[in-house]
Amino acid sequence: MTDLRHYDVIVSPSITEKSTLVSEQNQVVFNVAKTASKPEIKAAVEALFGVKVTAVNTLIRKGKTRRFRGFAGKLKDVKKAVVTLAEGQSIDVSTGL
């Protein structure tokens, strides 16, 4: 049985033009929790999807400044993880968890 903490680490798949391009190199992009470490992300992906992960790269996308009714606000920062899968394995992110 999967640990419920794995669902707290992986927030959602990131479906963008760039993420569909890197899927050809056997990589998948996820939005992850801000406090998640690379070993936690690797363990969560392997447990939830049943695949072998070879590498995890992370980045933090800074939130943009937005104006609403004359007041400046800021969108939240988002942490993303680019997960490289072992050769011959894949994840269909459109089906969900």
Swiss-Prot record:
Q: Which UniProt keywords apply?
A: Ribonucleoprotein, Ribosomal protein, RNA-binding, rRNA-binding
Gene3D superfamilies per record: 3.30.70.330
The highest taxon in the source lineage is Bacteria
Cellular component GO terms, alphabetically?
ribonucleoprotein complex; ribosome
Q: Name one GO molecular function term.
A: rRNA binding
* GO process annotations (BP): translation
What this protein is reported to do is described as: One of the early assembly proteins it binds 23S rRNA. One of the proteins that surrounds the polypeptide exit tunnel on the outside of the ribosome. Forms the main docking site for trigger factor binding to the ribosome.
Q: How does it assemble?
A: Part of the 50S ribosomal subunit. Contacts protein L29, and trigger factor when it is bound to the ribosome.
Q: Give the family this protein belongs to, as stated in its UniProt record.
A: Belongs to the universal ribosomal protein uL23 family.
PANTHER family tied to this protein: 60S RIBOSOMAL PROTEIN L23A
Q: What is this protein called?
A: Large ribosomal subunit protein uL23
From which source organism is this entry? Agrobacterium fabrum (strain C58 / ATCC 33970)
